[in-house]
């Protein structure tokens, strides 16, 4: 099972250093199934027993792109895993860069956690699967370092997870399109994680607020 934590705009380098130290000690040995996406200002240079990923990047090595992070910056911290397509990035106008980001990350051999998800209107109109398929049309579903995270927008940060029957329907559909690992994200917490992980085709979870405290994240990992 893959356990990924998206810390979003939380933690400083000082606090994430403590977070990483505790997680490293708990893990004991390197585990590629544990991924943490800290804010870029908190990236750590030291070796960790988990994969440190980037929440965002610009599809370039470097250049005249004010305020952006290029491959050169990720390389400095040994980062080879990126999050692409999160709905909070799409809402900020990231939609047009998604294909460019995916193609760049694939070209350079990054592990990619690619997020997809529908809003409540799309769900209620019965067009979820059609919508998700369209989101996936721009990427290579056979890329060997791809992970797909299904995060229904109506569940992100709301405290209300999607129903397990809905999750199962979506993951079964996605499994018919690709053989890569499939994650669920959207208000994952200690009360629902066991049920979510028991859904057929679920290969793990992408956790938000419930992973902000390392002790909580560890508890979710250990089950």
Swiss-Prot record:
EC number: 5.3.1.1
One matching Pfam family: TIM
Pathway entry: Carbohydrate biosynthesis; gluconeogenesis; Carbohydrate degradation; glycolysis; D-glyceraldehyde 3-phosphate from glycerone phosphate: step 1/1
Catalytic activity: D-glyceraldehyde 3-phosphate = dihydroxyacetone phosphate
Claim: DNA repair is one of the keywords in the record: no
One annotated GO molecular function: triose-phosphate isomerase activity
Keywords of this entry: Cytoplasm, Gluconeogenesis, Glycolysis, Isomerase
Active-site residues, record numbering mapped to chain: 86, 151
Gene Ontology annotations for the cellular component aspect, listed alphabetically: cytosol
Positions annotated to bind substrate: 6-8, 157, 187
Functional summary from the UniProt entry: Involved in the gluconeogenesis. Catalyzes stereospecifically the conversion of dihydroxyacetone phosphate (DHAP) to D-glyceraldehyde-3-phosphate (G3P).
Record note on quaternary structure: Homodimer.
Protein name: Triosephosphate isomerase
Source organism per UniProt: Campylobacter jejuni subsp. jejuni serotype O:2 (strain ATCC 700819 / NCTC 11168)
Lineage of source species: Bacteria, Pseudomonadati, Campylobacterota, Epsilonproteobacteria, Campylobacterales
């Amino acid at each position: 099972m893959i356990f990924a934590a998206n810390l979003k705009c939380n933690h400083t380098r000082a606090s994430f250093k403590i977070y990483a130290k505790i997680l490293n000690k708990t893990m004991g040995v390197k585990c590629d199934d544990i991924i943490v996406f800290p804010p870029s200002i908190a990236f750590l240079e030291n070796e960790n027993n988990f994969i440190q990923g980037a929440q965002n990047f610009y599809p370039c090595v470097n250049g005249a792109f004010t305020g952006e992070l290029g491959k050169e910056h990720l390389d400095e911290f040994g980062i080879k895993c990126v999050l692409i397509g999160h709905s909070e990035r799409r809402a900020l106008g990231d939609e047009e860069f998604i294909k460019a980001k995916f193609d760049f990350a694939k070209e350079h051999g990054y592990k990619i956690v690619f997020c997809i998800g529908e809003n409540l209107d799309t769900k209620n109109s019965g067009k979820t699967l059609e919508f998700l398929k369209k989101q996936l049309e721009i990427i290579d579903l056979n890329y060997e370092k791809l992970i797909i995270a299904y995060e229904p927008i109506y569940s992100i940060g709301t405290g209300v997870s999607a129903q397990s029957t809905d999750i199962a329907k979506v993951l079964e559909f996605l499994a018919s399109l690709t053989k890569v690992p499939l994650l669920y994200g959207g208000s994952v917490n200690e009360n629902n994680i066991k049920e979510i992980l028991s859904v057929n085709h679920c290969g793990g979870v992408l956790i938000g607020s419930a992973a902000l405290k390392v002790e909580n994240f560890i508890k979710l990992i250990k089950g």
